[in-house]
Swiss-Prot record:
It comes from the Viruses. Residues 1-18 form the signal peptide. Disulfide bonds join C45-C58, C53-C69, C71-C80. This is Pro-vaccinia growth factor. The record marks T96, T97 as: Cleavage (By host protease). Vaccinia growth factor interacts with host EGFR and promotes EGFR dimerization. It comes from Vaccinia virus (strain Copenhagen) (VACV). The chain crosses the membrane at residues 101-121.
Length: 142
């Protein structure tokens, strides 16, 4: 039983590699056969599979009853019904430039930091100016 699943997995990987290259499945679908019979393990669905896969090709696996979908590029899901979303940053036009305007909150924080630094520098300047004006006799230690 595990050999059948291994063959199915191998066939799915081959089909997926052909799908990524953009080739049509009718021309690239490998014919995987069992040693005892000449019936392909994976084949395209017949007329019963028309419309089963919304954005892809219907595949029937001999060992597992049921139909499965091989989704086209950009789609995912059991029946290829979901669109794969691309990153917004990569989908933008590269020729456009984006300018960022800082919010008023950020501007207030920056102005506050500048005011605090200015106040600290002024207090240090005033303190050193006062100590420099002291007479020399006040600085002598008894």
């Amino acid at each position: 039983m595990s050999m059948k699943y291994l063959m199915l997995l191998f066939a799915a990987m081959i089909i997926r590699s052909f799908a990524d290259s953009g080739n049509a499945i009718e021309t690239t679908l490998p014919e995987i056969t069992n040693a005892t019979t000449d019936i392909p393990a994976i084949r395209l669905c017949g007329p019963e599979g028309d419309g089963y896969c919304l954005h892809g090709d219907c595949i029937h696996a001999r060992d597992i009853d049921g139909m499965y979908c091989r989704c086209s590029h950009g789609y995912t899901g059991i029946r290829c019904q979901h669109v794969v979303l691309v990153d917004y940053q990569r989908s933008e036009n590269p020729n456009t430039t984006t300018s960022y305007i800082p919010s008023p909150g950020i501007m207030l924080v920056l102005v506050g930091i500048i005011i605090i630094i200015t106040c600290c520098l002024l207090s240090v300047y005033r303190f050193t100016r006062r100590t420099n004006k002291l007479p020399l006799q006040d600085m002598v230690v008894p």
